[in-house]
A protein has these predicted regions:
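Oxyanion-binding/catalytic loops of NTP- or PPi-dependent enzymes
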Residues: 1-75, 79-85, 104-336
Length: 336
């Protein structure tokens, strides 16, 4: 029948895994990383780049690259790259094809079957687009699995004889998904789900970049239009600084000069407190989906047995603290 792989097709990063017995194992990509950036680019020679190489190109040639296209799945939005038009499912197919190649290199044989995760709130069109992306990539999609169900399984909430109500709080790079999952008699069922397709860690990064640029006299929107190389370099540094500020209290960002030269630029020091103040208005947008998901499941927060954190943005202390405040309990931390 052939090996079935599991794919997390994410907004900012994707991953591929398989079951070794009953234990899931991540398959490393060509650069020996666990995550493949969900970025597609076309270089000057017309070669399609995917993952880390595309992300590197995006820093210096943002006009030749695209990311966050998961937000457009199921729509008719087209993206022009290298003079060609691509639908969202075609862009996703490039990422899936790259993950498929990594799996084939690992197993040393063809891989044609996959299970792909999607947000629980994805509608029928978005799910069909995901299946279509798999087909374009040469994969038979055996099943579309809701991300909160996959997360609950990963945290071990599937024991026979246990009955629990689990809230899965998934704040990734580009999307926010909150779901109530009921565990009963060894099965898992999503009782309710809500979220935002345009809310995630990328929004925190761009907000940080805007404040850093403003601090040196460059309004963000004007800089995006006139100095795209400067903006892309600052965004790249802000992404790294955001991760650093989850562990440390300060981070330094260097704003390049108009030519993109970092050495000739200015240094800006950002504190964790500043970052948290900047992103708090954005983080407030999680509250309405949380209220809605509890109301749809006809539950109060006191009826939630466990809270599970999923997605890279939940590594930020400000996010963990807000979840703790919302539910009055310590959430399960992010799994590697």
């Amino acid at each position: 029948m052939g090996k079935i792989i599991g794919i997390d097709l994410g907004t900012t990063n994707s991953a591929v895994a398989y079951l070794s017995g009953l234990q899931p194992e991540i398959i490393l990509n060509a650069p020996s990383g666990r995550l493949t950036p969900s970025v597609v680019g076309i270089d000057e020679g017309g070669t399609v780049l995917v993952g880390a190489t595309a992300r590197e190109l995006q820093v210096v040639r943002p006009d030749r690259c695209v990311s966050l296209f998961k937000r457009w799945m199921g729509s008719d939005r087209a993206t022009i790259l290298g003079g060609k038009s691509f639908a969202p499912e075609e862009l996703s197919a490039f990422v899936l094809r790259s993950l498929k190649a990594d799996a084939e290199a690992y197993f040393q044989k063809p891989v044609t079957r996959a299970v792909i995760t999607v947000p629980a709130y994805f509608n029928d069109q978005q799910r069909k687009a995901t299946v279509a992306a798999g087909r374009i990539a040469g994969l038979t999609v055996e099943r579309i699995l809701n991300e909160p169900t996959a997360a609950a399984i990963a945290y071990g909430f599937q024991g026979v004889g246990e009955n629990k109500i689990v809230l899965v709080f998934d704040l990734g790079g580009g999307t926010f998904d909150v779901s109530v999952v009921e565990q009963f008699d060894g099965t898992l069922e999503v009782r309710s789900s809500a979220g935002e397709t345009s809310l995630g860690g990328e929004d925190f990064t761009r907000t940080m970049a805007a404040r850093v640029l403003e601090s040196v006299g460059l309004p963000f929107e004007r800089a995006e239009a006139t100095l795209p190389l400067v903006v892309s370099r600052v965004v790249q540094q802000c992404e790294r600084a955001k991760c650093q500020l989850s562990r440390e209290l300060t981070a330094t960002i260097r704003v390049p000069d108009a030519t993109g030269d970092l050495a000739a630029g200015k240094e800006v020091v950002v504190t964790r407190g500043q970052l948290e103040a900047w992103v708090t208005p954005i983080l407030a947008r999680i509250e309405q989906p949380v209220r809605r998901v509890l109301a749809d499941a006809r539950l109060t927060r006191e009826k939630i047995d466990e809270v599970v954190l999923v997605g890279g943005a939940t590594r930020m202390p400000v996010v963990v603290n807000r979840v703790r405040e919302l539910f009055g309990r310590e959430p399960h931390g992010l799994l590697d």
